[in-house]
Amino acid sequence: MLPTFLIVTQGMQHKGPALLALISLLSSLIVLYLSLPILLPSTMPCKSVSAVCLAAVSMVAAQCNNTMPAAADLGWHAPNMTAINNLTAVVNGTGVLGFIFNTSATPATSSYSTYNWCNMPHVRAQEYVSVSKDYQLKYVEVIHRHHKRTPYASNTFPHETYSWSCDDEALFYYGTPIPDGTAAQINWKVFNSPANPFAPAGFNGTCQFPQITGQGLNDSRQHGKDLYGVYYGLLKFLPTEYDSSKVKYRVTNNVITSQVAGEVVEGMYLSTTNNPTQVLIQPASIDSLEPAYTCSAASAQYSSYGVSSKAANWTAHLNASASLFAKLDSVSGVNASDSGWHNWFDHYFDNLSARLCHSKALPCSSSNSSNCITYTDAEAVFRRGEYEYSFIYRDSPASLAASTGAFGVYMSELAANLRGVMNGSDPVIYRHNIAHDGSISRLLSILQLDVMVWPGMGSEVVFELYEKSQCWYIRVLWGGQVMRSSNPYLGRMDLVPVSNLLAYIDALVGVNGVKVPRLCSAS
């Protein structure tokens, strides 16, 4: 609501011009003062409220109409209703909306923007839409899921009927003392000893479960090439050669993100081939990117309405899938009482999609080779998995609060990075974060994506910060296209005032994440 003195001015057009000008000036100054908590951190290099700082803010406010956003809308806004989150379509439907689950290469008959679980669409030159030349790109932050991998050991069947070989790649693990050390390039080779009487869980063969596969490493390298093709090739924004003072890469404590990083970095900068390249990583107990810091309140919220909950709107799809579970269990050998496999479809989804992405046969029973999971069965699993992620991270009204606690620290880091560029204190122009589906899902949840999906392999969100006439704007790309938020305060995130995004993040988690510890400890 506008202050009374602002409303009064609308009816005083007939009064003396001097009086009207004075009232208008006072109105502007008061609105500016009320906006200072948002303006100071987001637009100016001010460390404290001083006369000089106020003058600088006044100047910017006069130049930009985007520095005084309305109060951020912190409400949860429902995603669009589609076949993804329609329970009837999920249970009784066929196919998976044209989504791809069996190749990294999206067929020429499909648009590149088509959902491809094995290798999701990302920014690349062929589809990239440049903004007007009036806008100058100042900063880019990329966050994406790792690329395709073997399934987690916990998601393999008690007895797999064929082996899985990873002899087409090498995974290196070694250390080097600094500054005067060297090392042999040590890589792991999985083997089975005839003198070891125990059989490995899941697949026999030469893979770790999980590890990024050889195909996944190739996808990772191409991802790096595609990003460089846009941000250097098209826009001449990135440095020609790798410069660690301007370009930063970050991984989580899960080694599969480092496996991806090795190829992404080389795909962007060939000079890094076989050369030491530093990536950033936070301590395992407080890693905000994975995320791995303890947030008991968020965990309690998720379990109150999602996986393991007894909430009717969660269990409805599980109860309607009893016959599907029975078929899957008869092939896999998983016990019907195993809650990990039956309180959601995550385990079956990971197992079956990993096979298909690597051109492996869908499984048959170890005791009856004619009893097999069909592609129709797999599609039924995939529909339910997509439904679950939409429900957990968007459809439930509790999802915004849960995701804010669980991923709020990364959001505060993103805001700090944007401010550092805007106020001139941070020389880094490009940050690249390699994360997980849980990271991307929570980010999309907080930004309130209008159509939620399970983020597939390589799923990518890009934040582009632009300046025009000393005003700052943000463009957010999801899968290479402008993101649409169900929250009208964010809306279509195409060159919106960055002050809107910063105000939204600040209101949720506080500057530098100061609200997150309290959010995570709330009962």
Predicted segments — roles?
Residues T4, T9, A18-A21, T43:
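Ala/Thr-enriched low-complexity intrinsically disordered regions
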Residues H14:
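Cationic, low-complexity basic patches in intrinsically disordered or flexible, solvent-exposed regions
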